[in-house]
């Protein structure tokens, strides 16, 4: 019988532990970790994500600021908001909610964030730290997945890990983190041939393609570990993953649900990285 990898439970445990650490930092150093979230436009999904992050930050005792900006804001004005938070010593983490409107260059916005406060881990300087084996700020979804694998005693050394999706947010950093644990990694994408055959070789399969129930049990080797990063809506508005959960659970040894798997861990790692940034600020 398959084991459920419960990201919600682990995230709650981590947040309880983090709340104690935040209180200790406040008592000993007089520092409260500060997180600034910048939302441009009124995309419904982005609004939900931002509210969840704000709620979680307040729950663990952070200072939380959310800036909601018009979708018509110009790039220079957005950068000015970021620079204000770069200079604010009470803010230790800055997050610009993606996606941004088409007239704004994502790369320039990411470059505008102080790498020490880039809790999303997207700045090229943080990417370089990750690639060189000295990670500082790591994209939150891949780091959350690594925590899940550790918590559920998944030994990655020598295992074949297949990742579906090569984005800078999940796929590429995920590959590096797995390599650092001595896994053998295959990174697949929309041009990969014989994808089903490649997936059936995976000891660990990580799916991040944004297509609801794309992965069926035909893609899964008996006893594999399946991590579903997808968040999609079906025709009835129900939240579903990229993996057809019920049938894949028949063959997988361990599997994450959607919701309640990877999503809560992404927020947990965002909070942890903000706390670590605040902690580093005490050593200046």
Curated annotation (Swiss-Prot):
CDD domains xref list: NAD_bind_m-THF_DH_Cyclohyd (cd01080)
Gene: folD
Annotated metabolic or biological route of this protein: One-carbon metabolism; tetrahydrofolate interconversion
PROSITE patterns given in the database record: THF_DHG_CYH_1, THF_DHG_CYH_2
Lineage: Bacteria, Bacillati, Bacillota, Bacilli, Lactobacillales
Pfam family, one: THF_DHG_CYH_C
Chain ranges passing through the membrane: none
UniProt organism field: Streptococcus pyogenes serotype M5 (strain Manfredo)
InterPro entries: Aminoacid_DH-like_N_sf, NAD(P)-bd_dom_sf, THF_DH/CycHdrlase, THF_DH/CycHdrlase_cat_dom, THF_DH/CycHdrlase_CS, THF_DH/CycHdrlase_NAD-bd_dom
Molecular function in Gene Ontology: methenyltetrahydrofolate cyclohydrolase activity; methylenetetrahydrofolate dehydrogenase (NADP+) activity
GO biological process: L-histidine biosynthetic process; methionine biosynthetic process; purine nucleotide biosynthetic process; tetrahydrofolate interconversion
EC number: 1.5.1.5, 3.5.4.9
This protein's name: Bifunctional protein FolD
Alphabetized UniProt keyword annotations: Amino-acid biosynthesis, Histidine biosynthesis, Hydrolase, Methionine biosynthesis, Multifunctional enzyme, NADP, One-carbon metabolism, Oxidoreductase, Purine biosynthesis
GO annotations of cellular component type: cytosol
């Amino acid at each position: 019988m398959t084991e459920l990898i419960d990201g919600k439970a682990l995230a709650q445990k981590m947040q309880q532990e983090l709340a104690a650490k935040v209180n200790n930092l406040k008592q000993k150093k007089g520092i409260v970790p500060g997180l600034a979230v910048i939302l441009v436009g009124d995309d419904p999904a982005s609004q939900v994500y931002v509210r969840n992050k704000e709620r979680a930050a307040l729950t663990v005792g952070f200072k939380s600021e959310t800036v909601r900006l018009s979708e018509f804001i110009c790039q220079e004005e957005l950068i000015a908001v970021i620079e204000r938070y770069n200079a604010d010593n009470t803010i230790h983490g800055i997050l610009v909610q993606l996606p941004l409107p088409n007239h704004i260059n994502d790369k320039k916005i990411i470059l505008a964030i102080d790498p020490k406060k880039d809790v999303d881990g997207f700045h090229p300087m943080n990417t370089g730290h990750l690639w060189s084996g000295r990670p500082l700020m790591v994209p939150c979804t891949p780091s959350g997945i690594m925590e899940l694998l550790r918590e559920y005693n998944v030994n990655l050394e020598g295992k074949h890990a297949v990742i579906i999706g090569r984005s800078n947010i999940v796929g590429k950093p995920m590959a590096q983190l797995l390599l650092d644990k001595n896994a053998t990694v295959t990174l697949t994408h929309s041009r990969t041939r014989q994808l089903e055959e490649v997936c059936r070789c995976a000891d660990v399969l990580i799916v991040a393609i944004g297509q609801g129930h794309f992965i069926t049990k035909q893609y899964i080797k008996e006893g594999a570990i399946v991590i579903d990063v997808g968040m999609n809506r079906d025709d009835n508005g129900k939240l579903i993953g990229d993996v057809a959960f019920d049938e894949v659970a028949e063959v997988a040894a361990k599997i994450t649900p959607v919701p309640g798997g990877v999503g809560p861990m992404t927020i947990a790692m965002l909070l942890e990285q903000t706390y670590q940034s605040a902690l580093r600020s005490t050593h200046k």
